[in-house]
Amino acid sequence: MKISFLLLLAIVICSIGWTEAQFTNVSCSASSQCWPVCEKLFGTYRGKCMNSKCRCYS
């Protein structure tokens, strides 16, 4: 049972699309500051502030 759980967990982790997030060097303190940056750079308003840097999602 434990092996099947670990196998399922490994499959889920491997199937996550890591390339969907785009990192930027733009400093931020709130996610709302990233929305215009993401629109300008990647054409999408979906973004958030992580570790004081904007991260945009496609």
UniProtKB/Swiss-Prot annotation:
GO terms for molecular function: ion channel inhibitor activity; potassium channel regulator activity; toxin activity. The record marks Y57 as: Aromatic residue of the functional dyad. It holds the Pfam family Toxin_2. InterPro entries: Scorpion_toxin-like_sf, Scorpion_toxinS_K_inh. Potent blocker of both large-conductance calcium-activated potassium channels (KCa1.1/KCNMA1) and voltage-gated potassium channels (Kv1.3/KCNA3 and ERG1/Kv11.1/KCNH2). Has the structural arrangement of an alpha-helix connected to a beta-sheet by disulfide bonds (CSalpha/beta). This is Potassium channel toxin alpha-KTx BmKcug1a. The lineage of its organism: Eukaryota, Metazoa, Ecdysozoa, Arthropoda, Chelicerata.
